[in-house]
Amino acid sequence: MSPRISVFAALAASFLLSGCIFSETPKFPAENAVAVFGDGGRFQGYDRTEDGRYKKADEAIFIVKRRGDGGYDFVDQKDEVQPISFHPIAGGNFVGQAPENGKSRYAYVVFRIAGNEAFIYVPDCDKQDKAQLKKLGVAIGQFECKIDRVADPAAFFASLTLGEPTSKLVRE
C-alpha cells in the first residue's frame, strides 16, 4: 500500500484502501461511539508529503455532522456522505469504523486528535507481524486483513504498528 493515501481516499465515498483492515460486521457497537469531533464542523484535508510536511488537498473540504446515534456523517464537496463512528483505543487514539459504500462490510482507520487537528493513520496489513495477526484471529488476504474473528478489536487496533499519518483534517 502506498503511504501517500489522500484525505479524500481515506474518508470519502467507499474507504476502498489497499492494505486495509475490514470486517463483514461492525466490530464496535454503535452505542459505544464517542464524539471526537464534538458537534461537528468544517474541516480542510491535508495530505502528508514524502518530506513529512502537509499539503492542502484539492477537493478535501468536509462538513462533519453529528448523528443521533453517536456517529458522524462526513460530507464532501460533491455532497457524498460517508457515515463513520469513532471508538477509543489505548494511547489516546480512536478507531474510525465506516461501512463501505456498495458493500456489506466495514473499513477501519485510526485517528489521533491534537487540538484542532485530526491525524489519520491507515494501518498497512503488510507491515504488521503476520504471526501476531494470525494469533489474534486475523484472516490475512493478499492486500487486506479481515478481522471478524478478532475477539478484542480495541486491543487489536492498539497493538498495530501505525506508521506515519497519511493525512490530517484541520478544523476551519
For every predicted segment, state its role.
Residues 21-39, 46-59, 65-172:
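Calycin-type beta-barrel ligand-binding domains and close structural analogs
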